[in-house]
């Protein structure tokens, strides 16, 4: 037997080991098979950084499969071996390099020399809020000790196995002081202040939105949207922002669970994700991927983005309003999924989180959240816009509203601070190093070096005017600013003449954002991200230039289009329009 590199799954402090999983219990898991012999390595960030922005080329889904997919021989060999061991093969995909398997616990133990056990672990406070208050603030999950082992027949063919650890890692986002006269805005109002293009035909664009809540213990979906709400919302928007999207629910099966939309129980998080992104990207298609927050759930989601089925369109932009502190994730086991998406030109946005510098981890240390901390992902922080003048000028502060009873941007009376800091998992990426960003200093004067710094950009966190279950609603958090920018860059792609495969695609967007002229950003210089619940925990402050509270700043849509038009000029066909 050979140990499978990277398969160990250490359990967080406070986790209790319970009993062994029943021998006959059916477990669904995913086997990841090596790329075909002779396949090139996926381009890394340094390679993307070295290619002039307008000269970058991206593959189609079919091109990706031909270039980077697994060989059919390897897929068949792995599937046949597992079938002979008594396991059931549910599906296989050479392009993705995946084999979906159903097996009894005893069969898994026999083949992989791993004992599956039940564990009880604490849920993050943010995750607890979405569950029945009568339930304990913990989860019971399946896991194992040590690492997975491979028999000789699978050694070198299998590079990872997902699904033998079912813990949750992730929670939704939304739940100093504000500028004068700060109040929640309608998305279209903020778009006008930010100079976003209005009325651009984004019908060629597809935005993917992750709905990762899963189901409750009764099998009811915990994250849903209501088509009638989406229609009503856009019927109430002004011209230039009132073209409704085509929303496509994508049901995913993870292990033995299938997740799908339940329109009878719409939720705020997902509803506003759809409405915010599509307000900016007029007429776009929005694919909503229903999954869960397990490791296997993330794999199912990101693989489906790359390999759409049936009439689904492949997204060129993805928005993720879920996060988990990155020390509890397994970077090289999941980061490759974002690296894959870069090859086909897909850009991914994710929240910085709403809990400040400690990212909701009460251990006295700063933490950042994954997937925003992944260097392939554009991480979005939060600001508050206020003091809006008739000229369109305004004041913008970093979002820092812990225990601020006078603020419209505080959740439950005390929560609400933008995330940001330095990853302990991912190294400083080339695009930050080449921009002179190699260290930051916290409130105690300590220098942080060597890690990936987040956020990359930042934006307004408080919107009103959404319609959920037929009623007007508002939402607060970096879960607002993230789909906002997903919509912007979809609209910019259309304004530049792009759309779909063969058009203008941005791919690994951070390698663009850090190269273009800094004049496209509004530098945020006021505010901090003190979490406020651990007095000894270090935090960071906004200042001139890049900082780990507001990143490069908030994005000026007009200036960004002008800068990108200059870069992509040989390819551009249309220029969009602006609403002042």
Curated annotation (Swiss-Prot):
<feature type="domain" description="Peptidase S53">
    <location>
        <begin position="181"/>
        <end position="567"/>
    </location>
</feature>
<feature type="active site" description="Charge relay system">
    <location>
        <position position="269"/>
    </location>
</feature>
<dbReference type="InterPro" id="IPR036852">
    <property type="entry name" value="Peptidase_S8/S53_dom_sf"/>
</dbReference>
<keyword id="KW-0720">Serine protease</keyword>
<feature type="binding site">
    <location>
        <position position="524"/>
    </location>
    <ligand>
        <name>Ca(2+)</name>
    </ligand>
</feature>
<keyword id="KW-0325">Glycoprotein</keyword>
<keyword id="KW-0378">Hydrolase</keyword>
<feature type="glycosylation site" description="N-linked (GlcNAc...) asparagine">
    <location>
        <position position="529"/>
    </location>
</feature>
<dbReference type="GO" id="GO:0004175">
    <property type="term" value="F:endopeptidase activity"/>
</dbReference>
<feature type="binding site">
    <location>
        <position position="547"/>
    </location>
    <ligand>
        <name>Ca(2+)</name>
    </ligand>
</feature>
<dbReference type="GO" id="GO:0006508">
    <property type="term" value="P:proteolysis"/>
</dbReference>
<dbReference type="InterPro" id="IPR023828">
    <property type="entry name" value="Peptidase_S8_Ser-AS"/>
</dbReference>
<dbReference type="InterPro" id="IPR050819">
    <property type="entry name" value="Tripeptidyl-peptidase_I"/>
</dbReference>
<feature type="active site" description="Charge relay system">
    <location>
        <position position="479"/>
    </location>
</feature>
<dbReference type="GO" id="GO:0004252">
    <property type="term" value="F:serine-type endopeptidase activity"/>
</dbReference>
<dbReference type="GO" id="GO:0005576">
    <property type="term" value="C:extracellular region"/>
</dbReference>
<comment type="function">
    <text>Secreted tripeptidyl-peptidase which degrades proteins at acidic pHs and is involved in virulence.</text>
</comment>
<keyword id="KW-0479">Metal-binding</keyword>
<feature type="binding site">
    <location>
        <position position="545"/>
    </location>
    <ligand>
        <name>Ca(2+)</name>
    </ligand>
</feature>
<feature type="region of interest" description="Disordered">
    <location>
        <begin position="1"/>
        <end position="21"/>
    </location>
</feature>
<feature type="binding site">
    <location>
        <position position="523"/>
    </location>
    <ligand>
        <name>Ca(2+)</name>
    </ligand>
</feature>
<protein>
    <recommendedName>
        <fullName>Tripeptidyl-peptidase sed5</fullName>
        <ecNumber>3.4.14.10</ecNumber>
    </recommendedName>
</protein>
<keyword id="KW-0645">Protease</keyword>
<feature type="binding site">
    <location>
        <position position="543"/>
    </location>
    <ligand>
        <name>Ca(2+)</name>
    </ligand>
</feature>
<dbReference type="GO" id="GO:0008240">
    <property type="term" value="F:tripeptidyl-peptidase activity"/>
</dbReference>
<dbReference type="InterPro" id="IPR030400">
    <property type="entry name" value="Sedolisin_dom"/>
</dbReference>
<keyword id="KW-0865">Zymogen</keyword>
<keyword id="KW-0732">Signal</keyword>
<feature type="glycosylation site" description="N-linked (GlcNAc...) asparagine">
    <location>
        <position position="236"/>
    </location>
</feature>
<keyword id="KW-0106">Calcium</keyword>
<dbReference type="GO" id="GO:0046872">
    <property type="term" value="F:metal ion binding"/>
</dbReference>
<keyword id="KW-0964">Secreted</keyword>
<keyword id="KW-0843">Virulence</keyword>
<dbReference type="Pfam" id="PF09286">
    <property type="entry name" value="Pro-kuma_activ"/>
</dbReference>
<feature type="active site" description="Charge relay system">
    <location>
        <position position="273"/>
    </location>
</feature>
<dbReference type="InterPro" id="IPR015366">
    <property type="entry name" value="S53_propep"/>
</dbReference>
